[in-house]
């Protein structure tokens, strides 16, 4: 099969491309958006149309959903296959989601339940995956040499393996720099009290995101009036103002509050290494290690940490985020917040440790920092299960089998 792959530099792209190739398929890449984030929908249409004329591809593939690509494939009568790996992806709410040549795979079952009725024969549920082989190769090389080269093109970037050891490691944004909620202006006292209470209530609940249901019409109207440049979709979009506020604005705000609180709490008692580009001035006890290279450093960080921490952003309502799969593929030990889909694939206490409150997280952290054998056994269990069932090769095989048998 010939696959035209539209890229924008998602961390998932190289692994999916490798899986396609290892299964014997050829891949032609459109790379313009990897370096030019100002590509317009019309330019996207032009890029894809030109590539289709030249490559004679059987399908077009992308990570996340591009309405422009969907429209092109609808004209060409060619399957447009995309795998949604983030949330929210606002483009899903456009009218293009109903096109009959779409084959959309959603990693979050709640998202699937939301969108499947709009295009029942063309939307699927598919969890994320990881590239176990690549991660183990990086770890094996580092252990053999005792060194890590984050930038393979720069020999001066070399570091000792021991520099990656951590008691507790967290890789990710604090969401403070991508939190549009804080742009609200001139809100009423009632609004402020309502929103503060709603955010605090949601912070106490794991496994169910109720913010969208709790927004009143008056709160929605005041939010729109007090938010400069309120996000609006094109005419005919399926998203409501309620969903936009709950997922795009409040979800990111809750993620920012939760991550800062949890990391502050942990770092006051334990050594916590944070790999991030976010401002950590509000976390004086954190060890800010800067950005981590996805391919060359993250697997080693996950493997060498005594405890890896996952805090799923609230817009991911029930699904398993990419971070969990990548920790497991690196044979790392993980403590994560509870997500309702996790027990469908992994056994709590055997493959993963789940917390449902700050108090539980502190107790689990203290226990597992002092029980190395249990950590290693749990990490190995998750690794073996991931290797057998949750690699990109397995997922890509399933994608291709489903699109070949679909109407």
Give, region by region, the residue ranges found by the protein language model.
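Nucleotide-sugar donor-binding catalytic core of glycosyltransferases
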Residues: 2-12, 16, 118-122, 127-316, ...
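Catalytic binding pocket for nucleotide-activated donors in carbohydrate/polymer assembly enzymes
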Residues: 4-7, 11-14, 18-23, 28-35, ...
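N-terminal beta-loop-helix "entrance" segment that forms/cooperates
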Residues: 35-52
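Active-site proximal beta-strand in glycosyltransferases
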Residues: 73-88, 103-106, 128, 169
């Amino acid at each position: 099969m010939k696959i035209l792959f539209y890229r924008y530099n998602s961390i998932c792209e190289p692994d999916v491309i490798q899986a396609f190739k290892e299964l014997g398929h050829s891949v032609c890449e459109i790379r313009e958006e990897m370096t030019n984030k100002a590509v317009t929908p019309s330019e996207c249409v032009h890029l894809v149309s030109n590539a289709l004329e030249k490559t004679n591809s059987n399908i077009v593939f992308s990570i996340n959903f591009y309405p422009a690509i969907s429209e092109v494939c609808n004209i060409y009568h060619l399957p447009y296959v995309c795998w949604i790996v983030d949330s929210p992806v606002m483009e899903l709410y456009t009218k293009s989601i109903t096109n009959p040549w779409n084959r959309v795979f959603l990693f979050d079952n709640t998202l699937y339940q939301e969108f499947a009725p709009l295009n029942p024969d063309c939307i699927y549920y598919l969890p994320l995956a990881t590239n176990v082989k690549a991660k183990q190769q990086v770890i094996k090389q580092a252990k053999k040499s005792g060194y890590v080269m984050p930038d393979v093109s720069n020999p001066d970037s070399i570091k000792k393996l021991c520099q990656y050891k951590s008691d507790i490691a967290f890789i990710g944004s604090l969401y403070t720099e991508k939190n549009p909620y804080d742009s609200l202006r001139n809100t009423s006292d009632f609004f402020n009290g309502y929103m503060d209470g709603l955010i605090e209530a949601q912070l106490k609940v794991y496994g169910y995101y109720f913010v969208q249901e709790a927004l009143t019409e008056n709160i929605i109207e005041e939010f729109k009036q007090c938010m400069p440049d309120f996000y609006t979709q094109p005419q005919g979009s399926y998203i409501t103002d309620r969903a936009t506020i709950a997922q795009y604005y409040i979800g990111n705000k809750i993620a920012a509050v939760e991550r800062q609180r949890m990391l502050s709490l942990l770092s006051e008692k334990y050594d916590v290494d944070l790999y991030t580009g976010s401002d950590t001035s509000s976390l004086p006890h954190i060890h800010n290690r800067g950005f981590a290279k996805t391919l060359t450093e993250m697997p080693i960080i996950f493997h060498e940490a005594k405890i890896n921490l996952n805090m799923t952003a609230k817009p991911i309502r029930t699904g398993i985020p990419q971070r969990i799969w990548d920790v497991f593929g690196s044979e790392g030990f993980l403590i994560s917040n509870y997500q309702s889909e996790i027990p469908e694939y992994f056994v709590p206490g055997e493959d993963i440790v789940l917390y449902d409150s700050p108090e539980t997280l502190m107790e689990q952290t203290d226990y597992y920092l002092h029980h190395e054998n249990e950590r290693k056994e749990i990490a190995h269990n998750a690794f073996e299960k991931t290797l057998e069932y949750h690699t990109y090769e397995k997922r890509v095989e399933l994608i291709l089998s489903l699109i070949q048998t679909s109407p």
